[in-house]
């Protein structure tokens, strides 16, 4: 008899399609100064406040409504009239924390998100359940870069042997690099993928939100296959039914995560240092996710920070890996050097993408991007003082081949974003 209980159902289904937490702060700041907020006021005020910090063009009018809805469920604002909302005591307290104690502000926001959505704890638990033998590492596939897939006419929706071969080779490559990262039966994968690919092709092409005749419209097989892969992998791995245990975590089908919501939750949970992800690992065709936190009955290690308000359905507390510098110094420096050398050997150029180095060091050491920045800053200062036998150079330039990655999370040291790193041994 299974004694594991269901997860508490969320009070709000459907996360807002934004990932910038400073939108909460700015909306509350407007509510405090103006005495209220509504959609029209946010549309006018927020773009001016976040210009240079957020891609303003990416904030749609729907996002403003999502923002109001979430702030209401968090208890930070309350409805006063048909369209106007006023800041609450809890909202004032959170706004104050944003100014004087950012760590506590993050804690408060995470606690509210857990209460409302349940997703933070559930998502981390699901990663561990999907790949318990390899530290919760999971891959959402994308077609291999060397796959040659030509464009087709929109109406040509045939699933070919070539698509089957590419789809199988893609997941086998990922599983070869990281064991257990894709717990999906191959034959079922191909069947589900074919159905989704053809479903996408059955839809009419659109331009500027309008359907257009498909007679002269071409489409990219790679793009359609990529979207189909991501859609069905997210549906399989992050639905209310656990694909490994075949048991339900929630009763309501609205708890199934969509690909769109998945793309929001990944950066949100990374911002909370619960997990990391990357779309740019050269060895992995797709998005690689891995937790940097885990659920435990108890903990005696000083390298972990507890979050008592984050519990799984077995009532275990979530602990985030937060090692201190003195405890991880040697491992960090050694790993940084090894990862840099691996990239250098493959690319044979001195300056390597700092984002690529960051992603792999974080994966190997299970540390957050924030800790990586702190530890890199310390290591850089040690190199300047010749306390290590290596010189480290950091550059803010962006190479031409890095333009497509400009929207990736940056690496910041002392408030400056760096994009390239070079490491050379000091010969005595």
Each predicted region: which residue ranges?
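Donor-sugar nucleotide-binding helix/loop cap in glycosyltransferases
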Residues: 2-339, 350-353
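Short alpha-helical linear motifs
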Residues: 134, 379, 397-401
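C-terminal engagement modules used by replication, chromatin/transcription, nuclear envelope/ESCRT
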Residues: 272-276, 282-314, 385-428
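Intrinsically disordered, low-complexity segments enriched in Gly and acidic/Ser/Thr residues
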Residues: 324-389
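Intrinsically disordered, acidic Ser/Thr/Pro-rich low-complexity regulatory segments
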Residues: 248-255, 265, 345, 351-365, ...
């Amino acid at each position: 008899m299974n004694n594991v209980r269901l997860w508490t159902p969320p009070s709000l289904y459907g996360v807002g399609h934004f990932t910038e937490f400073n939108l909460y702060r700015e909306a509350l700041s407007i509510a405090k100064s103006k005495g209220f907020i509504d959609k029209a006021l946010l549309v006018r005020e927020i773009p001016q406040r976040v210009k240079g910090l957020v891609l303003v063009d990416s904030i749609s009018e729907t996002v403003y409504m999502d923002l109001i809805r979430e702030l209401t469920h968090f208890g930070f604002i309350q409805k006063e009239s048909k369209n106007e909302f006023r800041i609450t005591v809890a909202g004032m307290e959170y706004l104050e924390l944003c100014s004087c104690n950012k760590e506590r502000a993050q804690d408060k926001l995470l606690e509210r998100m857990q209460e409302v959505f349940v997703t933070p704890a559930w998502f981390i638990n699901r990663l561990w359940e999907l790949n318990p033998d390899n530290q919760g590492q999971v891959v959402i596939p994308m077609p291999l870069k060397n796959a040659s897939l030509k464009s087709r006419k929109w109406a040509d929706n045939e699933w070919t042997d070539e698509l089957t071969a590419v789809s199988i080779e893609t997941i086998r490559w990922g599983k070869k690099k990281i064991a257990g990262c894709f717990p999906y039966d191959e034959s079922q994968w191909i069947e589900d993928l074919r159905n989704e690919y053809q479903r996408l092709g059955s839809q009419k092409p659109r331009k500027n939100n309008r359907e257009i005749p498909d007679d002269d419209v071409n489409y990219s097989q790679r793009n359609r296959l990529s979207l189909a892969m991501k859609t069905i992998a997210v549906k399989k791995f992050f639905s209310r039914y656990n694909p490994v245990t075949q048991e339900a975590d929630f009763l309501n089908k609205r708890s199934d995560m969509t690909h769109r919501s998945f793309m929001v939750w990944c950066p949100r949970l990374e911002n909370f240092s619960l997990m990391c992800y990357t779309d740019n690992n050269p060895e992995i065709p797709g998005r690689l996710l891995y937790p940097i936190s885990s659920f435990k009955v108890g903990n005696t290690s000083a390298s972990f920070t507890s979050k008592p308000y984050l519990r799984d359905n077995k009532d275990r507390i979530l602990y985030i890996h937060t090692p201190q510098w003195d405890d991880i110094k040697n491992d960090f420096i050694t790993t940084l050097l090894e990862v840099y050398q691996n990239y250098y050997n493959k690319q044979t150029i001195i300056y390597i993408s700092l984002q690529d180095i960051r992603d792999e060091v974080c994966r190997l050491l299970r540390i957050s991007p924030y800790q990586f920045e702190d530890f890199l800053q310390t290591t850089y200062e040690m190199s300047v003082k010749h306390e290590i036998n290596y010189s480290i150079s950091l550059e803010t330039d962006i190479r031409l081949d890095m333009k497509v990655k400009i929207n990736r999370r940056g690496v910041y040291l002392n408030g400056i974003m760096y994009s390239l790193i070079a490491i050379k041994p000091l010969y005595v």
